[in-house]
């Protein structure tokens, strides 16, 4: 019997395979209790084209004195930021890779913000 973590990792591997067949860059999301990370990875998986996280100094300053990166408001900031960076790198369309995390809460907030900022997925 697989643990929750093993199940999530298995789902993420299967998703990565499906996304690789599409031939578009992928927007990956990783979340921890304290931070959320987003990367735009090239279609062949060899390069990180853009990245944003709540661990960045500029983002921590914009979050205020509390500096909490583990909430939906912080995820929304990261979604807007990753969309800006991806557009600056010339990327308009991505495949969303949630890495096995449920599409709820912080992951959903990041995805919605990235869509609002102009990324298509």
Curated annotation (Swiss-Prot):
Coiled coil: none annotated. It comes from the Bacteria. Keywords: Ribonucleoprotein, Ribosomal protein, RNA-binding, rRNA-binding. Gene3D superfamilies: 3.30.420.100. The keyword Transferase does not apply. Part of the 50S ribosomal subunit; part of the 5S rRNA/L5/L18/L25 subcomplex. Contacts the 5S and 23S rRNAs. This is Large ribosomal subunit protein uL18. It comes from Verminephrobacter eiseniae (strain EF01-2). The lineage of its organism: Bacteria, Pseudomonadati, Pseudomonadota, Betaproteobacteria, Burkholderiales.
